[in-house]
Amino acid sequence: MTNNKFKSGFVAILGRPNVGKSTFMNHVMGQKIAIMSDKPQTTRNKIQGIYTTENEQIVFIDTPGIHKPHNALGDFMVQSAYSTLRECDVVLFMVAADEPRSTGENMIIERLKKAEVPVILVVNKIDKIHPDRLFEIVADYTSQMEFSEVVPISAKQGNNTERLIDTLSEKLDEGPQYFPEDQITDHPERFLVSEMIREKILLLTREEVPHSIAVTTDQMTRDEETGKIHIMATIIVERKSQKGIILGKGGDMIRKIGKMARRDIEIMLGDKVYLETWVKIKNDWRDRKMDLADFGYNRDDYM
């Protein structure tokens, strides 16, 4: 690209769990790169989505929802989210219009007051409220701190997201193109495969199971005869009872997880996939630093 006024920068998306951060980024990217579910703490790692046009490259960093951690994995997730404040050029503080400001938001606001970059308040899920309520919601948040801009959106419906992109572009300085124009994320395919499998477990299971699992993609090879991509993945659980839930009666659940995940993986890779999944028990892995690092949650990466 030869544009003397090409703009670029890194934009962190911060907020409590389930305010729509991943939904927004997937909408902007035009395809799924961050998994979504109705479970809190669905996003565990920082996910970078790369939005490129002729005039700009915006690298979005979708962070884990900020919450009060209850184990070492939770500590990792919160540390990962806050570490983006040291790396970004702009912060999007996303809140849900249909939920009142909570102690969680107040905690984030106190951190954001110390930020040395512009902070934009993004009021998401405006499709769920009456328009008359919007002024009241914005007034409540702006009474807590000064934001450089306020942009109401509906990430699910795409309302006002273009305006938010334009606002971000105005805040960014001229800069280089960090990634090739056809690259939409910095994560390797194996990570995305693991996340798509984990998403289906989040959708299909309940209670403690969704938060107690990790997924690793152990092997990805192409079968030269069939052209299919052979993927071997391991689902890690903390208890024998959880393994039984993941497997299901007669293997029904593990087959359902595999079928749903394979569909998304094939769309992402653009190839037919043979997916083989195994279930392994690792007692209390969420509180073991070595296990966390093995499964891709290394806290030292964000210190």
Curated annotation (Swiss-Prot):
Gene Ontology annotations for the cellular component aspect, listed alphabetically: cytosol; plasma membrane
G5, as annotated region: 153-155
Keyword Kinase: no
List of residues binding GTP: 15-22, 62-66, 124-127
Keyword terms: Cell membrane, Cytoplasm, GTP-binding, Membrane, Nucleotide-binding, Ribosome biogenesis, RNA-binding, rRNA-binding
Domain KH type-2: 205-283
GO molecular function, one term: GTP binding
G3: annotated span: 62-65
CDD domains: Era, KH-II_Era
Region annotated G4, chain positions: 124-127
Location within or outside the cell: Cytoplasm; Cell membrane
Segments forming domain Era-type G: 7-174
Bilayer topology annotation: Peripheral membrane protein
Keyword Protein transport in annotation: no
Any single biological process term in GO: ribosomal small subunit assembly
Quaternary state and interactors: Monomer.
Function per UniProt: An essential GTPase that binds both GDP and GTP, with rapid nucleotide exchange. Plays a role in 16S rRNA processing and 30S ribosomal subunit biogenesis and possibly also in cell cycle regulation and energy metabolism.
Name the UniProt record assigns to this protein: GTPase Era
Organism: Lactococcus lactis subsp. lactis (strain IL1403) (Streptococcus lactis)
